Amino acid sequence: MNAFSRLAALALIPALLASPVLSATEAEEPFTLIRDASDTSLEEWAWIKRVVVVFADSPNDPRFAEQMRLIEERPEALLERDVVVITDTDPKARSEVRKALRARGFMLVVLAKDGSVVIRKPAPWDMREISRSIDKLPLRQQEIRER
């Protein structure tokens, strides 16, 4: 190291000491598991997360309420499987998610990370059933093996 390099390094020390250091938890915002279809798109999650979409014609639909209760009871099962949940209870808004999946009434849709539809269900599913359908996917099998 020549004299110039040493001086340059010494000059940087005060700046480095003065800059705030963020921990990993402070640097990252907490992940929001459940998102509204008006605030996101399927393309946003391609190859990043698996997507579970819950459609209904109204947030008051008893099937929608039941599905959301089941999801909210065991969020760790979805977080462990790299899932984001998208809800759409406003068919008049014609969200991009609703148009892409052509939903009518209540529908539960699970998509793989590549965006392909894994399941479509006209009734609520419990977390065990959703988890099993995700765990059968080839990419999920690979993730389990690599742990």
Spans of features found by a protein language model:
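Non-catalytic interaction/Regulatory regions outside core domains
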Residues: 2-147
